[in-house]
Amino acid sequence: MSNTTVEQFAAELKRPVEDLLKQLKEAGVSKNSGSDSLTLDDKQLLNAYLTKKNGSNGGTISIRRTKTEVSTVDGVKVETRKRGRTVNIPSAEELAAQVKAAQTQAAPVQPEQTAEDAVKARAEAAARAEARAKAEAEAAKLKAAKAGNKAKPAAQKPTEAKAETAPVAAETKPAEPKEKAVKPKHERNGKGKDAKKPAKPAAPAVPQPVVSAEEQAQRDEEARRAAALRAHQEALLKEKQERQARREAMKQQAEQQAKAAQEAKTGRQRPAKPAEKPQAAAPAVENKPVNPAKAKKEDRRNRDDEGQGRNAKGKGAKGGRDRNNARNGGDERVRGGKKGKKLKLEPNQHAFQAPTEPVVHEVLVPETITVADLAHKMAVKGVEVVKALMKMGMMVTINQSIDQDTALIVVEELGHIGKPAAADDPEAFLGEGAEAVEAEALPRPPVVTVMGHVDHGKTSLLDYIRRAKVVQGEAGGITQHIGAYHVKTPRGVITFLDTPGHEAFTAMRARGAKATDIVILVVAADDGVMPQTIEAIAHAKAAGVPIVVAVNKIDKDTANPERIRQELTQHEVIPDDWGGTVQFIDVSAKKGTNIDALLEAVLLEAEVLELTAPVDAPAKGIIVEARLDKGRGAVATLLVQNGTLKKGDMLLAGTAFGKIRAMVDENGKSITEAGPSIPVEILGLSDVPNAGEDAMVLADEKKAREIALFRQGKYRDVRLAKQQAAKLENMFNNMGETQAQSLSVIIKADVQGSYEALAGSLKKLSADEVKVNVLHSGVGGITESDVNLAIASGAFIIGFNVRADASSRKLAENENVEIRYYNIIYDAIDDVKAAMSGMLSPEKKEQVTGTVEIRQVISVSKVGNIAGCMVTDGVVKRDSHIRLIRNNVVIHTGELASLKRYKDDVKEVRMGFECGLMLKGYNEIMEGDQLECFDIVEVARTL
């Protein structure tokens, strides 16, 4: 390190390069740039030059910059002036010391002080310490005057400690810059410990004042103003603490009064919210003796903060307070960190909260609800609901769903009122939609349902009206599906519904959808009133719709219309020409006789009913029929009841929804809209809806999807509940119970009397263990719907004088559904009785096979006791059950472990022969005991 550059040497001396180059030129060393190298001789020349120029006493230049700040505290202007700072410029001796240190590399390059410089520094430090001690003494006096005599010892001891500390601080290092922030607690404590040691000066010197009298006066004035400001702040703080203490007392008194009033009102005590404790009220109210050590520590902290803490706010010092903080009563929390951000409270904020009554919410709880939604309804945090559920033994998360009963219990536990919410009823939604859309009601065509007994000519009558041959397309000539048609007549439009039976009609009536306005009751003139006809009359009367009787097949020679009128009169269907209200029309579907008169009678009934429906409104209707087409997907026949159905509408039908992609009428023609009472085929639903489902047009897909998914969940829950008993895990539980087995039967007969008699006879066969469950009974052939019902329920089908069509037989063969045909009712009863007998649990009986006498007992180690026996009666078999009888008392019942004769294992031993045997798990046998051998035989039971 003998050769260094000018730039490096300037950095070591902490001098600008230009100044150093100038001084080198003045010393006779020619250097032009900072990159030129300096030798040891060059440095010595520079040192000699500076020593000659400045002398040994030069080197300290005081640069002071005063800054005055004016602050306003509660209307009082306080002027504070910041002290200047001293910048030390190294002298020639210090430069020489730095050069020497660079050569030896024994210590970092630091300007060394000579003895004379050290004396000067100590004198300056002593003067500053004395001035600071004076300021502290004045501040302590002012503080003592305000707070009383309790702070006098605490103010005197820190002053003495500070006076002792000053020489040591001056001896160890020069005055520190003002930028340093407040030191940590442990550093202050360490400084205090060092202050207790007596400081010995290095050399005796007379301290000389380094500041002028004017500057000293300014410093004294500044210290006095700071002490006055601090005393004023402390007085304000004390006053605020007293006010806060009074508020605390008032709050506690108000809480006690509110608590007493609540107890008197409710009769039970609720735990009140604990009030927050005041943090700064205790020192202002209580006059406790001050600990001298604590007072000394606090005063030392205040002294350290006096010069530096005043600017701590602007410099991010931790723990510093400014005047605004003191004005707010000290309620400003300082968050640790680099920037020292502060979380400010409002100036008038306090811990007092007025007692309020607990808010009780009325919570509507749906069938399922998540924990988060339940907490939101009660206006509590989700953690509280999770805690309540955990106390009930349920480990749940905030996103987990709980059932309605559990949610109601949680609501009650948390002090609120829980009520089960009404289900998302589609009917209610329809009502809201109807109220929202008010459209003018216009006349609509009547909807007519054709009912009657099988083969009485319902479909043939509709064929003639429609001028089509629909019957030829049906398998076996029997109507299997519901058909919907509308016919235009000179007097208006009529919509017809053709049904194979009464089931679909009954389902419509049960749901309250008024799909039918008028019923045409078709009765064959040559057959008379049949049970199905009577049932149709009952359904029409239950629905409250008028009846028009069409007496068909009057073209036959055996036709007797008058007999039909007489028979119907017995069922309260009285012709209008006999003084009743029912129109009777004699027609012939084959020849078309009086068809126009029948349509005229239907339109006359429609005029009396004054049928109207809104047209300019969202459509709603009922699903008449639905199927899954291979090429087109879900196809549904919809009967529009209100409004106008348009292509592109969003339709909801049961659990199915979708945008209508195509609309086709009954003739196969594509249409774009359909008004009230018009049946159409629609395409575009997401799934096949059930027949009889209500359909409605919604505004958007979101609402339709929401309701459809809700219904799917409801139907799924119902389905799972029904299947619960048949699950594998519950099967053994059901076996343990004495539940009766069920034999499910579907009965289809030619006439109502036949299936009623057959159903009644089968139900009489029911016993305690086996019951007959007639799932469905009806008149007509076996259809695909019957086979599907049998597949779903595990039933078999009885056909009494009827047969299944080709499609039904094929479906039954593929799904292994048993179909039995009978012509005699007793054969059907006997077969069902035999099937029920097979379902009965067999009866177990004991059959004694032989008797054995024990004549000798042989004990064999590690084997047990072996009985030497004689078969006295019957046969003893190896797998026989035995009873050990001693003195005519049964001692043990069990099985044989082994059966031998002459050391050979045998399967049986007959009477009169000897044998040896062992009992399984039993050795307590004696000579003279009797063994009774028996077998358990299962005997089939009969009804």
Curated annotation (Swiss-Prot):
MF annotations from Gene Ontology: GTP binding; GTPase activity; translation initiation factor activity
Cellular compartments per GO CC: cytosol
Chain segments carrying region G1: 452-459
Basic and acidic residues bias: start-end ranges: 117-141, 173-197, 216-250, 295-308, 319-335
Annotated binding of GTP, by residue: 452-459, 498-502, 552-555
UniProt-annotated stretches for the region G3: 498-501
Start-end of Low complexity biased regions: 99-113, 145-172, 200-215, 251-264
Positions of region (G5): 588-590
Localization, UniProt: Cytoplasm
Region entry G4, spans: 552-555
Record-linked NCBIfam families: IF-2, small_GTP
UniProt name for this protein: Translation initiation factor IF-2
Organism, scientific name: Neisseria gonorrhoeae (strain NCCP11945)
